């Protein structure tokens, strides 16, 4: 799995690392797989908001709830990424050839965007079915709400160390 691969990567890099650690070019993880997941999440959102595909997508649960859970999951991935790397492409990310060189956003701007994304997702949920095939919470929207609020709380705790007025 993911942890086993990371551990093996660390071990190999420890043995192959040069004498001067500050000049090491080795890195255990990069953000490419995370942006790949976010691309898939954006596709879910697109399928549920596009007039041509919306009806077919509703067979997998309420369109609003699919978009809400996708945005919560996207916020989760971006929170992990910004905690690890700090500044990264957020507001202009995942535009493909439309914007091959997205600007980097500050961590403060990313966190502001993530709080807004989660709040929007929570307010857009409806009483319809949650997403079918949901391997995290089985389509249980109450659990998705708890997860979203927990994510907001964790982000606020992290942010409180940097900016007490926001956290």
For every predicted segment, state its role.
Residues 7-87, 97-133:
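Conserved, well-structured interaction surfaces
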Residues 24, 89-94, 139-141:
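Solvent-exposed, flexible loop/coil residues
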Residues 82-93, 162-167:
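Short, well-structured active-site flanking segments
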Residues 1-2:
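Hydrophobic alpha-helical membrane-insertion signals
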Residues 133-139:
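N-terminal post-signal-peptidase region of extra-cytosolic proteins
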Residues 112-130, 141-167:
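Aromatic-residue-lined binding/catalytic grooves and analogous aromatic/hydrophobic interfacial grooves
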